[in-house]
From Swiss-Prot:
GO terms for biological process: B cell activation; immune response; interleukin-4-mediated signaling pathway; negative regulation of inflammatory response; positive regulation of DNA-templated transcription; positive regulation of macroautophagy; regulation of immune response. Residues 1-24 form the signal peptide. Disulfide bonds join C27-C151, C48-C89, C70-C123. Glycans are attached at N62. The lineage of its organism: Eukaryota, Metazoa, Chordata, Craniata, Vertebrata. SUPFAM superfamilies: 4-helical cytokines. SMART domains: IL4_13. The keyword GTP-binding does not apply. Participates in at least several B-cell activation processes as well as of other cell types. It is a costimulator of DNA-synthesis. It induces the expression of class II MHC molecules on resting B-cells. It enhances both secretion and cell surface expression of IgE and IgG1. It also regulates the expression of the low affinity Fc receptor for IgE (CD23) on both lymphocytes and monocytes. Positively regulates IL31RA expression in macrophages. Stimulates autophagy in dendritic cells by interfering with mTORC1 signaling and through the induction of RUFY4. It is found in: Secreted. Keywords: B-cell activation, Cytokine, Disulfide bond, Glycoprotein, Growth factor, Secreted, Signal. This is Interleukin-4. It comes from the Eukaryota. It comes from Papio anubis (Olive baboon).
Amino acid sequence: MGLTSQLLPPLFFLLACAGNFAHGHNCHIALREIIETLNSLTEQKTLCTKLTITDILAASKNTTEKETFCRAATVLRQFYSHHEKDTRCLGATAQQFHRHKQLIRFLKRLDRNLWGLAGLNSCPVKEASQSTLEDFLERLKTIMKEKYSKCRR
């Protein structure tokens, strides 16, 4: 049961169209989830959001979009790994403790989604300027909203 030469071009065309549709659809879904996570994170005011993080977004002029996403995921992972059990972040009350756990959960989700969007195995992160986690997340949200508007076109 071989394919005739007349069937091959339409099959390749359908395959290419399906791939482009799936890529655009996945881009749309992933970005929407990232933006929703960033909205939740930036609304939270916890003790940890005032701590500093390596601001790779300030020094991302000569990097590709994928490298920027990869580096953002890397610094977020470094941040939440270091501060997950940090007593400065845990707070004194049960409510502060709950907010901190929620913050870490959202940062892990954001990390996972950024890695998926980047599609890279690893990326180097050079020491750059520092900013608060709150400012970093706001800038990342702006970048993601711009990408989302381009993805929808």
